[in-house]
């Protein structure tokens, strides 16, 4: 179905290259196909699809730098490519992609600090970069990046304590930071981070006993604290 849609959108995009909506639709189609290919385990083909979408997103973003939707599309495209590269073990190239996405996310977040979606996007970029840096053995840089994301997530969580997604984001940040600190041999600081995460997990888990993700988070927290 996605390929049939892609064929139609390619025809439309060729027919009128100045029609930005059709161009964006085509980029979305490439990304959806990439998502399917990735789930099927075909990383190289997914990467090709994502790069086709990225090329269109770059063209649109250059055409109108003030169009925040197109800028966000471009940031997401970079992150998708980074995800595939990282899964393939190509950390350095993944880092380049993630940093390209981060640069856009930072610009958007500065443009409208009240836009919580853009603020959250920025935290996601920080965490992706931190994950790669940690895998490369650069604990201090990973920690700094994770903490940059944590600061934003703390602000979001305070703004809306009822937003469970933001609360869980905060749990994830505390846990990532705890992992780095533990690896660095800083047990007391790691324990403080883990306990901050546990407090959130203990709040979320009773709220919805059927939510297996939250139940697992609680189990993981207890395991890390020991």
Model-identified regions with their sequence ranges:
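Thr-biased low-complexity repeat/linker tracts and other Thr-enriched repetitive architectures
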Residues: 1-226
């Amino acid at each position: 179905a996605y390929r049939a849609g892609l064929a139609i959108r390619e025809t439309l995009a060729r027919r009128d290259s100045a029609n930005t909506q059709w161009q964006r639709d085509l980029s979305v189609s490439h990304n959806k196909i990439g998502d399917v290919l990735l789930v099927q385990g075909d990383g190289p083909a997914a990467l090709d699809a994502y790069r086709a979408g990225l090329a269109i997103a770059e063209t649109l973003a250059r055409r109108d730098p003030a169009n925040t939707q197109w800028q966000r599309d471009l940031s997401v495209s970079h992150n998708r490519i980074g995800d595939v590269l990282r899964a393939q073990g190509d950390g350095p190239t993944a880092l380049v992609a993630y940093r390209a996405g981060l640069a856009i996310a930072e610009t958007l977040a500065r443009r409208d600090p009240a836009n919580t979606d853009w603020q959250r996007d920025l935290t996601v970029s920080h965490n992706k970069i931190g994950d790669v840096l940690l895998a490369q053995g650069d604990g201090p840089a990973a920690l700094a990046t994770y903490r940059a994301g944590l600061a934003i997530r703390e602000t979001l969580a305070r703004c809306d304590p009822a937003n469970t997604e933001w609360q869980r984001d905060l749990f994830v940040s505390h846990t990532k930071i705890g992992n780095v600190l533990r690896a660095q041999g800083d047990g007391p600081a790691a324990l403080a981070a883990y306990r901050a995460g546990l407090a959130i997990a203990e709040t979320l888990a009773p709220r919805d006993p059927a939510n297996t993700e939250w139940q697992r988070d609680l189990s993981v927290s207890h395991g890390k604290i020991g």
